[in-house]
């Protein structure tokens, strides 16, 4: 038999036809002599009727003993369903297949968990048995949607003159940015390849080579901490263009995303993408990836706060910090004391030292400790600056610039969620431009490239590269959708003198720069066109368009938070022989074989938080998860401590018998038990009557 139809494709127009279906048994109902099977494939579900009068006895016996999720092939006639079995919820609900022949292609063993769509299954279990989880219609739909998004992007780029070119997966390690995944070389002992964090250098070399327009659906790998929107290996749609300026690329990107949206969502984006500079985005929204689905912009009141008598505000203003506020319009009567305390707790979690607030009732009555620190004129000026009206709730943060931005950005999103303002069906794109070229690293005590060392500064800022790096703006840009950064790009440095200055500003000696990027320095000597590019995360875009909660919902085989694969148990130890060939850690490998390390116990922080009734932010989940697993690891290490030769600990109370094995106690004597009873009848103790 050969499959003639998908299970989910049979319709009433096929009635009377002979069809062969293949799929997984999703449900079985034995009515005595007639067995109904729900058979599922990627297109949907078909009802198969196994009647002992129409099926060979052996085939009917198979139908009687089928386990759920067994794979079968069934041949029969498509017919109209009886009225009582009609199912309007299914596309195939009007028809069924009367089986004439049934073959079990693969018998399923009892399942590790329920495959019912409404079953509550732990994510760790679903990821361990990902091949079963992939049978869920929701996940299959997400992966097909992902394919459509990728095809739509490629369709646009192919039509716009781009050439798809693959770049190497085994690259040179350049320790700037995230950590590399390293691959040892067998042929060159002691040397390592790095798996690509992006095709950045290679696509620039393609521009030097005259390819003009390049794109690639590239696999990228970064050894960094995971979040809901981050995986160690991910897919990005990567592109680069020659002889372009920033404006050319921004216009190209807007057309690209509008085309993708039109093709896969069936909707037009009827607005031009707003553009904000990095500074403007930080000032108005507290972050460089603003969610524009709602307003509630941050207002700066530092100058006004500096004139009041509130010591916290004045001290922050005097020390060069910021005092900023968020007006939650119409929330005064909605926010209870508990709500305000919750927001205060969130503010503390974001690093603020507290949260001042003003509550203006609908009647005009004001609740706030702040009012007494302002003169009447100052107070009115403050309310006017904040557009404060009856019914508004205004919250304040006073601290260093970064702390204020982080806190008010987080609180803005918290309030947006409370008020239901972040509609998942509303898609708001924007560009963020003019990022700082450098950011200060407290850990390394030097300036680091905010994007990468190949980003072109603005021409007018070049004189400040060596004298005032914090002042230098880059020709870099991000595309943001609903508060999520989809991707980044920039105009690249194509002049050798500017690239040399950049390396010096980053603290590279000439020898270090040549050791890491010598081939690029040489390439720039032989004629390099002005060029720029962009890359966006395919996984992130799909996650946003589907309204998914995690990248794991749109990737076939994702990693978990510790970058492990629960299905294959990767990473894992390798044989000593493999390491010997690589001339790498031979003794360690031998020891690993003799004494395999125990896996450190871990516990999901979400589970602990739910049990403890805790409400944690994403940052708190990461921090507390690390602390919890550190404690578990410490407890495991304590269990492994050899206490054979450790002297017995001295105690205040006797401890002679604490390690004695338990033995049955001698039975109590009847007379002894009854001796303290006031009265007793036979073997029963008499007690006073308490209730009638």
Residue ranges of each PLM-predicted region?
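Class II aminoacyl-tRNA synthetase catalytic cores and aaRS-like
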Residues: 1-596
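Alpha-helical initiation/capping and key positions within long helical/coiled-coil segments
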Residues: 248, 623-627
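Short amphipathic alpha-helical/adjacent loop interface patches that line ligand
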Residues: 23, 257, 609, 628, ...
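Small-residue (primarily alanine) positions within well-ordered alpha-helices
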Residues: 76, 609-612
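Long, charge-enriched, surface-exposed interaction segments in small proteins/subunits
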Residues: 596-601, 606, 614, 629-692
């Amino acid at each position: 038999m050969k499959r003639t139809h998908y299970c989910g494709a049979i319709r009433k127009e096929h009635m009377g036809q002979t069809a062969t279906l293949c799929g997984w048994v999703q449900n079985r109902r034995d009515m005595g002599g007639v067995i109904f099977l729900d058979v599922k494939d990627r297109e949907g579900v078909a009802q198969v009727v196994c009647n002992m009068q129409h099926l060979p006895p052996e085939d009917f016996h198979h139908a009687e003993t089928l386990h759920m999720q067994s794979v079968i092939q069934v041949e029969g006639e498509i017919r109209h369903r009886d009225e009582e079995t009609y199912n309007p919820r299914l596309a195939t609900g009007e028809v069924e297949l009367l089986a004439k022949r049934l073959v079990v292609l693969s018998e399923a063993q009892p399942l590790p968990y329920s495959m019912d769509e409404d079953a509550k299954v732990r994510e760790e279990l679903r990821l361990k048995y990902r091949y079963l989880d992939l049978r869920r219609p929701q996940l299959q739909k997400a992966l097909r949607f992902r394919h459509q998004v990728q095809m739509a992007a490629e369709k646009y780029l192919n039509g716009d003159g781009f050439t798809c070119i693959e770049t190497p997966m085994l690259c040179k390690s350049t320790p700037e940015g995230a950590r590399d995944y390293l691959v040892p070389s067998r042929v060159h002992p002691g040397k390592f390849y790095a798996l690509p964090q992006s095709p950045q250098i290679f696509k620039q070399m393609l521009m030097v080579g005259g390819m003009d327009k390049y794109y690639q659906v590239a696999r990228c790998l970064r050894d960094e901490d995971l979040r809901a929107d981050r995986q160690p290996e991910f897919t990005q749609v990567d592109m680069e263009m020659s002889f372009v300026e920033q404006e050319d690329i921004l216009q190209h990107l807007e057309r690209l995303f509008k085309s993708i949206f039109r093709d896969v969502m069936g909707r037009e984006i009827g607005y031009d993408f707003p553009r904000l500079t990095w500074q403007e985005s930080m000032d108005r929204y507290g972050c460089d990836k603003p969610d524009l689905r709602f307003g509630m912009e941050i207002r700066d009141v530092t100058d006004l706060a500096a004139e009041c008598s509130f010591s916290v505000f004045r001290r922050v203003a005097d020390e060069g910090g910021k005092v900023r506020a968020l007006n939650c319009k119409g929330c005064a009567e909605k926010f209870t004391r508990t709500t305000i305390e919750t927001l205060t707790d969130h503010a503390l979690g974001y690093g603020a030292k507290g949260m001042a607030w003003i509550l203006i009732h609908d009647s005009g009555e004001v609740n706030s400790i702040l009012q007494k620190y302002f003169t009447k004129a100052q107070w009115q000026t403050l309310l006017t600056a904040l557009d404060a009206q009856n019914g508004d709730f205004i919250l304040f943060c006073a601290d260093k610039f970064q702390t204020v931005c982080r806190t008010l950005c987080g609180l803005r999103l918290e309030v947006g969620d409370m008020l239901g303002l972040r509609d998942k069906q509303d898609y708001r794109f924007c560009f963020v431009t003019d990022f700082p070229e450098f950011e200060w690293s407290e850990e390394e005590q030097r300036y680091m490239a905010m994007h990468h060392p190949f980003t072109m500064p603005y021409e007018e800022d070049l004189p400040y590269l060596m004298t005032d790096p914090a002042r230098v703006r880059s020709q870099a840009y991000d595309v943001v959708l609903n508060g999520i950064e989809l991707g980044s790009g920039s105009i690249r440095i194509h002049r050798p003198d500017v690239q040399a200055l950049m390396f010096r500003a980053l603290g590279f000696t000439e020898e270090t720069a040549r050791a890491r990027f010598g081939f690029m320095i040489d390439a720039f000597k032989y004629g390099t066109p002005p060029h720029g590019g962009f890359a966006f995360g395919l996984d992130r875009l799909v996650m946003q368009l589907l309204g998914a909660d995690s990248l794991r919902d749109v990737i076939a085989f994702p990693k978990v938070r510790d970058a492990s694969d629960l299905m294959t148990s990767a990473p894992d130890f390798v044989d000593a022989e493999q390491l010997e060939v690589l001339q790498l850690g031979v003794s360690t490998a031998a020891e690993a074989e003799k004494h395999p390390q125990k896996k450190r116990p871990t516990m999901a922080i979400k589970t602990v938080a739910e049990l403890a009734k805790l409400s944690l932010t994403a940052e708190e989940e990461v921090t507390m998860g690390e602390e919890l697993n550190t404690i578990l690891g410490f407890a495991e290490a304590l269990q492994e401590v050899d206490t054979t030769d450790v002297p017995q600990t001295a105690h205040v109370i006797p401890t002679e018998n604490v390690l004695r094995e338990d033995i049955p106690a001698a039975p109590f004597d009847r007379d002894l038990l009854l001796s303290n009873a006031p009265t007793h009848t036979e073997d029963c103790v008499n007690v006073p009557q308490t209730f009638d």
